[in-house]
């Protein structure tokens, strides 16, 4: 059985494919406080196990640590990290009392699972605008089955995707890929896929192929396929700002990119330099960007590596300007007024700085609410 409890005015994430009516009253488990944002608290039994949160750090039992749903482009997965690439706000408390909780909330959400207090599960967020789904069943398996039913059937990859794939930055020509395939075959190591990083593109532009390095690209795709190896090209979430580039021109013309508060297209740097980001909260933009994959599908490509979509940014123009200004002050400072640690913190924070992209979320939220 699944019950929905509503707090405030939630943002419609479209996470569920089935509509569940709101249940009146209080949650059957734990307590809720809305004095400072939103806080859910549940006292755990000594033997309770907490499962869930998708691809996160540490073991299967999430008890004993603090996790933050805040998608982050961080390749260093040390145990002290609290956020990784994805955010899956679903947990199952398994013990004398077993139940599942799904927090339908699109922004930063903190799961303190026996970290601050060993017996306390605490889930908190800044704004009390969310839906909570309470899932009860015969056991943890039944709870997960019910949850998967309401979020829709998962995508089932093709058979080759369950095989081994080789991925490495720096393969720039056909010969590089042929050498990799040959090495695996000669050493009797199975291989089903070779990933193509950004070097296959023309100037790192989405939905392009470097024709100098990959002439007759469809024939090369078929050559690899004849060896039962699929080429899996990368597609980044950033579209290069370049007048005359078809994807850029179409996105600007049709307002498909994320906006700044003043209505202009948000600019930040990733691999191609200055880029715009498709507004995936806009259904028309989603369809437009998705249709562009046909460019590669029609050349024989059967799978893709979607990257940089946390979103990941190297720097924004505002962040870079602030860093340059501070660097100038630091260079001229002969009295030690600008501390070296301040300089270090500024340089380290220009990448993936949430302050640089927060207004795109706000703008999108306002647009969809109108």
Where are these regions (language model features)?
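Gly/Pro- and small hydrophobic-enriched strand-loop and loop-to-helix capping segments
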Residues: 370
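N-terminal leader/propeptide and maturation segments of large enzyme subunits in energy/redox metabolism
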Residues: 318-324, 328-359
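Aromatic-lined carbohydrate-binding/catalytic grooves of carbohydrate-active enzymes
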Residues: 155, 159-303, 308-317
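Conserved small/polar residues in nucleotide/adenosyl-binding loops
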Residues: 360-367
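Catalytic and substrate-binding clefts that recognize carbohydrates or anionic sugar/phosphate headgroups
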Residues: 1-158, 168-169, 174, 181-186
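Surface-exposed loop/turn and secondary-structure junction residues enriched for glycine/proline
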Residues: 56, 63, 71, 88, ...
């Amino acid at each position: 059985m699944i019950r929905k409890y509503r707090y405030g005015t939630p943002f419609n994430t479209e996470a569920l494919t089935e509509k569940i009516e709101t249940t009146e009253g209080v949650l059957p488990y734990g307590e809720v406080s809305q004095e400072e944002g939103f806080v859910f608290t549940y006292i755990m039994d000594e033997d309770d196990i907490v499962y869930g949160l998708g691809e996160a750090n540490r073991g299967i039992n999430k008890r004993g640590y603090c996790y933050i749903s805040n998608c982050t482009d961080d390749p260093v997965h040390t145990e002290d990290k609290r956020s990784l690439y994805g955010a899956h706000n679903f947990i199952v408390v398994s013990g004398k009392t077993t139940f599942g909780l799904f927090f339908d909330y699109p922004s930063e959400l903190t799961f303190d699972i026996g970290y601050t207090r060993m017996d306390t599960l605490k889930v908190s967020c800044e704004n009390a605008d969310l839906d909570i789904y309470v899932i009860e069943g015969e056991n943890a398996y039944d709870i997960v089955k019910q949850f998967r039913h309401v979020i829709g059937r998962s995508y089932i990859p093709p058979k080759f995707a369950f095989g081994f794939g080789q991925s490495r930055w720096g393969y720039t020509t056909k010969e590089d890929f042929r050498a990799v395939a040959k090495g695996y075959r000669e050493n009797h190591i199975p291989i089903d896929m070779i990933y193509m990083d950004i070097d296959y593109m023309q100037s790192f532009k989405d939905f392009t192929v470097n024709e100098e390095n990959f002439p007759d690209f469809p024939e090369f795709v078929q050559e690899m396929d004849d060896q039962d190896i699929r080429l899996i090209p990368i597609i980044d979430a950033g579209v290069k700002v370049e007048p005359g580039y078809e994807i850029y021109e179409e996105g600007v013309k049709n307002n498909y990119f994320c906006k700044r508060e003043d209505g202009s297209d948000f600019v930040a740097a990733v691999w191609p330099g200055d880029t715009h980001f498709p507004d995936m909260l806009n259904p028309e933009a989603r369809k437009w960007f998705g249709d562009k994959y046909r460019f590669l599908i029609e050349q024989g490509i059967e799978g893709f590596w979607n990257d940089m979509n946390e979103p990941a940014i190297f720097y924004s123009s505002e962040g870079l300007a602030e860093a340059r200004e501070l660097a100038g002050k630091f260079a001229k400072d002969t009295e030690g007024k600008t501390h070296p640690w301040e300089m270090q913190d500024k340089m380290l924070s220009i990448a993936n700085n949430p302050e640089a992209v927060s207004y795109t979320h706000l703008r999108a939220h306002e647009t969809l609410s109108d």
